[in-house]
């Protein structure tokens, strides 16, 4: 059986930027929501400085939490870093949008600062800055083949379109904190989390049950291997601008806190019972990435490193570790 280390983190573009830039990011999101009405908690957090005080606190928590993950990852020294994240029309668009895709190339590039929201970044890096990561090609091909033979209808790609940024931000953004040096071989796995939310030409997202089953199939493959594999679930949980039960104006604290307790207590498999409509209403589209990881890791209690539930961030952010 492969040795496993689990990591959970967020990937929102603001995590790459100084807190002084967060307000502008919020304003871009608010503008997308027709008749946007800020919830009372957001107004309180904005205070008299348009949220800067809250943003400074939250940004430091994000950086510190990633430092904990990085320290554990590098001390553990995996043979493979499997990052499960969603591609938001960065490589997969209406012409080809599978529910799941395994990357099988020998290497992959990422341009994390090419996106306008990350031009003003913590590293002072130029927009064209490129990061190249080597990938475990033979391992990825073996996993792809095993999953398909195990009943997972899985796409694979040995190159990315990545018109502007290569790796999706769900993968490259966490890597800027975890392993920008590319010390460990990277295996990207892509999930269509947004589904029809992106428009009528996009197919529905896979169900939570199916995502958990894919994770279990991955675990069955890993049971035949001897590598040390770090499994990274990359996403925030509920997003205010996707939470339809709140007219896309507020994060779903009640649902996220309930789900967090299940993950904390080692009952993550319960999340597979969520319905597609519950995911849609709560704005928890990206939770599907975590559900796949939970399928791999099994019902083990998580060490919760940090939780950010400020409405100023527009999403509920959890940082977690699993020692398996």
What are these regions (language model features)?
Residues 79, 83-92, 159-165:
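Short, glycine/charge-rich beta-strand/loop segments that flank catalytic centers
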Residues 89-91, 238-241:
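Short, active-site-adjacent cap segments at secondary-structure transitions
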Residues 1-76, 98-213, 224, 243-324:
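Flexible, D/E/H-enriched segments
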Residues 79-85, 189, 227-237:
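Beta-strand elements within well-structured catalytic alpha/beta cores of enzymes
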Residues 64, 86-88, 221, 228:
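Short HxH-centered metal-ligating active-site micro-motif
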